[in-house]
Amino acid sequence: DRNTGEDKPVTIGQLQRHAVDWLYENRVQPFKRAASTGKKVAVIGAGPAGMSCAHRLSMLGNQVTVFEAKEKAGGLNEYGLAAYKMVDDFAQKEIQFILSVGGIEIKYGQALGKNVSLAKLRKEFDAVFLGTGLSGVNALEIPGEDLPNVFDAVDYIEGIRQNKKQRVGKKIIVIGGGNTAVDISVQSKLLGADDVILAYRRGSEQMGATWKEQELAQKNGVLIKHWIKPVQIKGDSKGVTAMEFETTKIENGKLVGIGERFTLECDTVFKAIGQVLVPKDLGDAPELLSIAKGRVVVDAEMKTSLAGVFAGGDCVNGGTLTVDAVQHGKVAARAIHKMLGGKNG
């Protein structure tokens, strides 16, 4: 009522966090599992999609085994979000909260194609959910991309999150327009970089980063340059020294360069232009699954082309928001439960 009276929006995110923090601090578990169905489901990947699916399946009485390639669960919430956005080991607290409902086991160091086989899982479990995420990085496809001190933003952020000593340059250029580009830009400033330029080939309205994220970057001293695209990275065996750009515009609905070029000095370049699905993400699955445009093809219930195999999250939509991945997991869990003869999914 107070917010309404002052014509201010309700801060839904803060309200949700207040409620969740109270549950965590008081170790209250409001969910209760249904009676056991006797069914077993394998979930590949302990990110938002996988853990959402596992939680809903467990709530419905199914036994779930989660196979996670890394040493910790959480996916990009644990490894890919900037450190300044996360507090008090929140991702791991969330995982423990999910596990406390019961019926979920996580096996770490288990990756498709290495020590986990989709064919074997299909035989041992009643259903399988793929939430593998994306491990490949889009290439700039320009000269100099392989020079020292050209980094993938997500990998660099992962190093920071896992308390690895990460060197930060003084003059940094970030290529991209999404939230990850903002994350690495702001994180670099917080780590002591003198100048950080975020370069994006289109305008601010076309950026994947929200207005709030763009504003956050600018408040932290990040200079955002629009309508420029990278042409080449200059440097030598010791590292990067500069980056050449060309100004761009939209012509007949397509992005084109207009011939005007300029160079910006830098000692570090971060690529934040999205991740892609690569064969190793799916182990032995690519030969079996329907893949289109670098994504696993699913229907409205998150079913893949393989009977009994479902998928969700970044490997399906190419990488959007956490809430989308969580919703994928919920939808898949209901469909799996229904397929296995369950009710009230």
Region locations from a protein language model:
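Glycine-rich dinucleotide-binding loop and its adjacent helix/turn
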Residues: 18-35, 96-109, 114, 137-191, ...
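Rossmann-like dinucleotide-binding cores of NAD(P)H-dependent redox enzymes
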Residues: 66, 70-100, 106-107, 160, ...
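Feature captures the FAD/FMN-dependent oxidoreductase FAD-binding
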Residues: 35-36, 40-44, 92-142, 232-244, ...
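Residue-level detector of alpha-helix initiation sites
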Residues: 6, 47-49, 72, 178-180, ...
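Iron-sulfur cluster-binding cysteine motifs and their immediate structural context
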Residues: 1-19, 65, 103-104
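A conserved FAD-binding loop/helix module that cradles the flavin
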Residues: 184, 315-343
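FAD-site-proximal beta/loop scaffold in flavoenzymes
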Residues: 146-169, 252-319
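N-terminal Rossmann-like FAD-binding beta1-loop-alpha1 element of flavoenzymes
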Residues: 39-65, 181-189
